Amino acid sequence: NPGVNNPNLLKPAGPVDPEISFISVKSLDDKPIALLANYSLHYVGGVPAGVISADYFGVFAERMAELLSDRWQDPPFVGIMTNGTSGDVNNINVQPKEIKRYKPFEKMKIVAFEAADAVFAQLSNVKYAEWVPLAAEYTEIPLAVRKPNEELIAWANEILAKPMDAPKKHSLERHYAQRTLDLAKWPDQIACPLQAFRIGDLCVTAIPFEVFTETGLEIKDRTPLAKTFTIELANGSFGYLPTRSQHALGGYETWLGTNRVEVDAAHKIADTLIEMLERLKKAN
């Protein structure tokens, strides 16, 4: 998030994953039952203050129902869009030639409709099977929690002791000061829940962090099965999950309080999931 047309912008900090993965389920009499998709893009936002929104995920679900089913279908069709590995990918063009202003809900509809229409266009190529092997695995791995040192705790207390209207060196200093003190109360390690599901030659993995796209692409590249995609913020929300290289760059996703676990966490999680997928590959 460098801001629009920031003159200090050098290059993107990481890769993107433009692929939309999906699982389509229908009955033996060809009636659509459900479709679960996965896309690596941060939520879009753009709603009035005080409004709670399902964002493009919800709009995608509605659009898929419009495209695939009769509104009176019973039971009703279920469309689902899941959040892919998009902890470091958002929808903002930071170098636009012309800045466009969107109306409330407008941009999320653009994203959702383009995604839904792209999936719909590929449905004719889907090969359905009456039977596929199913398998699942769950595990928890310990991850060390990053803790503030005494100097940082003293800084946080000093910041929070100031009046709310005191001049700030950084607009978010009170926010991060509070996060620092909160993290000091965390246990020394957490149990990180990880899941992997096999559906035929497809696998789905689940991670309880805002996962960087680099990690999602690594899992896709290393998977022992034909296709794999990852759902982030699944079974928990433990903050951002930068890679070692991103920690070295020092973006805000690596700051203490935004990131809460050890530097090697992303790599430990990826390695564990690949081991789980290897076992699922052998399952019949």
Positions of predicted regions on the chain:
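Non-catalytic substrate/cofactor recognition surfaces at enzyme active-site rims
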Residues: 1-284
